[in-house]
């Protein structure tokens, strides 16, 4: 696709695959709104006061129908918004078209190259010559990363005149990042400093991005305040767990039509995502094996009737492999060569480095057969056996299906709206330093409460005497910060 910005009749910038899909996208947005009570409650509660009036928000988060409802909640509260996806395969093109036509600048389409992906990220951050966004909604930390790397390069350029050299790294994706920063230096050597100086803060959606933020905080390199949305209970214990329980089998069946019952499934990692994936496979009738490094998580898995074994002990027995760890080098090409014919290998962690795709792509004589988009059979020349890789080792539930359902994403995205409001409302108070924060317990409970009515649930009320007996306020919060749900 030619990388040039287009404009709507109203003058709004965009780059999407097909604007003729906008009406279809609008119909699905209207369906999703009914399933997203938390976001709709935010519109009702905060819309009249327009708390985001004057705020610029950049989003780097999967451009799906559910994200469209989030975007239109932010604009309903007064924000100006520019958006890109955080994964090359996760955009739903009808959602991107509807939002680009009706609501905000969107730069996203399904099946981006890495070059296109980072171009879209740069466009979403580009608010013109007077700096970037006030706030960032990030998922995986790529928008945050680009600003940090840009500031670092500008400081080096100012000090020594050195410009980023893409050849200085073997990582093909980071070469693209350095090229973008290098080109930016030529037009404005303070471009990313201007962004950094304007930024109020970022709210981060997922485990991988949160890890990046805590690493920067530990190293003293974090440039602006950050709210860790991922570790809100109403995000990690719902989106990560129940969302993956729903979307993993959806992606598997859309991609392969595989019969899960009777198969052996291996789930690498037994955190919240792994728990949801293991539950889905077990409920579908698979025999589930878990790999784990953490003895506590391993013990939890055994208490659920799951086997816990190292990958190398069972690699030749497994039919379906799912990586969920957020770590790298979980399944290597040496493991793939030992797998049974047509074993399915997929990842539901954020990045594509859990499965050794580079090792597979460069294996001598390996043959790639594309069955359909995001479903490839790779055949090893020496064994004649093939394995099926989904979404090129990237997020399979969004690459091969449509991700998590609207209701569970309403929990996550309501946390995002609240986090963005918190950062914006406190921008001049000094409350938030260049550190990583989590939302307080009473807001977590509020997000949960907003979703109960839709499910027909009613809470029991404490009396004052009962509340005093267990030392909590009648109106909550009901659990201490350290409570493990």
UniProtKB/Swiss-Prot annotation:
Binding-site list for substrate: 64, 139, 205, 235, 239
Coiled coil: none
Catalytic activity: S-adenosyl-L-homocysteine + H2O = L-homocysteine + adenosine
Pathway membership, UniProt: Amino-acid biosynthesis; L-homocysteine biosynthesis; L-homocysteine from S-adenosyl-L-homocysteine: step 1/1
Cofactor(s) required, per the database record: NAD(+)
Tissue and organ distribution: Mainly in floral buds and stems.
InterPro entries: Adenosylhomocyst_ase-like_sf, Adenosylhomocysteinase-like, Ado_hCys_hydrolase_NAD-bd, NAD(P)-bd_dom_sf, S-Ado-L-homoCys_hydrolase_CS
Residue positions binding NAD(+): 206-208, 240, 269-274, 292, 327, 348-350, 397
SMART domains referenced in this protein's UniProt entry, alphabetically: AdoHcyase, AdoHcyase_NAD
E.C. no: 3.13.2.1
GO MF annotations, alphabetized: adenosylhomocysteinase activity
Assigned keywords, A-Z: Hydrolase, NAD, One-carbon metabolism
GO cellular component: cytosol
GO biological process: one-carbon metabolic process; S-adenosylmethionine cycle
Pfam families named in the record: AdoHcyase, AdoHcyase_NAD
Primary role: Adenosylhomocysteine is a competitive inhibitor of S-adenosyl-L-methionine-dependent methyl transferase reactions; therefore adenosylhomocysteinase may play a key role in the control of methylations via regulation of the intracellular concentration of adenosylhomocysteine.
Homology family: Belongs to the adenosylhomocysteinase family.
HAMAP family linked: AdoHcyase
UniProt xrefs under NCBIfam families: ahcY, PRK05476.2-3
Subunit structure: Homotetramer.
Protein name: Adenosylhomocysteinase
Species of origin: Petroselinum crispum
Chain's gene name: SAHH
